[in-house]
Amino acid sequence: MACMAPRGPAAIPHPSSERAGLRRPARCAMAKAVNPRKKALPAPLSIRLYAPGMTPLLRAGAGGLAASLRAILGSASPAAPWPSPVRLGPGTATVEQEAIHLDWGGKAPEATLRALFGASFRVKQGFIDLPGTRPPGAPEPPPELAAALHDALKVTFLQHGKSTQGGARRRVTFEVDARPVIVESQGYDSFVHQTAWQSVLEALEVGSTSLASWAYPGAAERHIGVRVTKVEYTAAEALCACFALVGCVSYKLPQLRGGAFVALAPTNLVRFAELRPGLTPKRLRDVAVAGASDAVLAAQLVMAQEAGKKRLGAVLGTTEAVALRQMPWNAQQKIRGAVVRQDAVLEEVLDRYEAAAAALPHTLRVRKPEGKATGEASYFIAISALRAFITENLAASRPWYADFATATTAEGRFIHDYRDRDNLGALLWHERKGLIAMHPYLGEAEQWLVQSVHLALRSRFKSIYADTKESAPATRSNRLKGERERLRLSFAGAKTPEQVRAALADLWSRAGTNRELQEHWRDILQLLGPERWRAARDLALVALASYQGKGGEAAELEDADEAAGASEQS
């Protein structure tokens, strides 16, 4: 029962009352003197995966926090099972499937937060080091890979100059195609995440805090000075925003001179912490992606390979990729150029992407000094335009060949045409194997159409080769290239179902007997109607671009293509 003190005038004893034998009212034994200068300790902090306001980026940050705690545990107690309580100075952290709990150990939160951030965000030899992104006990990446991963963070989370401090430029030497190359990267002495615990502490004390653009790359305040449009974070949200640097995977976008990051929202924090180190690119060429679609599928594929494709849904929920690039109206910072979000991971989509990525890998190329300069050679990562096209279709749940007839690169080059010095083609000779690798992922009717076009092409080119057998090689080559160009323009220029049918009929009639066409005419006919004529046009150009000849005419075509490809690679 609570002590009750006398109220009103009765609470002030009269001097005569003591003389009359009345005692002064006793002070309540439960009452304690309160020091107004001493702050009460905040309650333990709990981060819940499905709490209101937890966006995919913040959920990815919760996964990054779990991965960092696992790295700290592995460093301090290698034999401890995961998940076990993680000691952070006076406090501890505990990871559950859908929550992370931080206890301050009876001390001010500052000591616990300092220990957590100090062990999670480091700089080694000028390069950013995030232990949560590496397997426990794994050796450090080679210098050229560490520099590339460092640069990927610079063009995503740490692009603003105020987010980093100090540091000298680092020179790294390694070999590409048995030739020494040198790459320079700006090193850092520190970066903003190392002291961001102060913002979390502010949120614990006053209820919320504001974070700069490094917490949400590519985002901006809609109306500067209008408070209702300003993003504010609770303590749990701020902590997740800080560790999004670990939970997300950052890539470089060489073609756009920008970057991309993928926020993988976990459904199981314990399991995600085990899988996160496997998402970090292990090869230099894998640090680059062709776009946001390539980034989201690349991250999902690696996660599926680590967890198993059939079990991926038990670990991963929403996946969101953001491509950042410079825009004409903002030269200082890269802003969002594309966002790709997938709420479900389809196994058949990952199978198709895996085939495309294997056949069309990014490649390292030596960049020679321009003109007569005698400087040192550097390198660049060459990105396949065809891979970018295929991955955009796959990420959008479209057939991988959709709009092959009309798709262009950012420079206005056509995806369906082979590149040469004097044309607007984008394909390179070696990318033909990428088209061939995707043939098994066509429907039955689509495959019959492609094969019927291949047979017709073989007949036409064989006839041209026979007609020019006694002619000069240049004459034969020009005839073969001219026929292929005529067919390409005929298919690409078709704008109606009638024009598509006319272009195909012209090819088939010139080629003579076509066994595939005769046996599967009813199947092919489905593609020539008003509903699917665009698909037929795309597939005809896929067949033309993926055609591999036999005998002499194959050599002529390949020589011409290799000459064009060599001019692009040099």
Curated annotation (Swiss-Prot):
UniProt region (Disordered), positions on chain: 1-23, 551-570
Keyword Plastid appears in the UniProt entry: no
Protein name per Swiss-Prot or TrEMBL: CRISPR-associated protein Cas8a1/Csx13
Protein task: CRISPR (clustered regularly interspaced short palindromic repeat) is an adaptive immune system that provides protection against mobile genetic elements (viruses, transposable elements and conjugative plasmids). CRISPR clusters contain spacers, sequences complementary to antecedent mobile elements, and target invading nucleic acids. CRISPR clusters are transcribed and processed into CRISPR RNA (crRNA). Functions in an unknown fashion to stimulate transcription of fruA independently of the intracellular A- and E-developmental signals.
Organism classification: Bacteria, Pseudomonadati, Myxococcota, Myxococcia, Myxococcales
Keyword Metal-binding carried by entry: no
Gene Ontology biological process terms in this record: defense response to virus; sporulation resulting in formation of a cellular spore
Organism: Myxococcus xanthus (strain DK1622)
Gene assigned in the entry: devT
Observed effect of gene inactivation: Decreases sporulation 1000 to 10000-fold, aggregation is delayed. Delays for C-signal-dependent methylation of FrczCD and impairs fruA transcription. This mutant should not have polar effects on downstream genes.
Record InterPro entries: CRISPR-assoc_Csx13_C (IPR027811), CRISPR-assoc_Csx13_N (IPR019989)
Family per record: Belongs to the CRISPR-associated protein Cas8a1/Csx13 family. Myxan subtype subfamily.
Keywords tagged on the record: Antiviral defense, Fruiting body, Sporulation
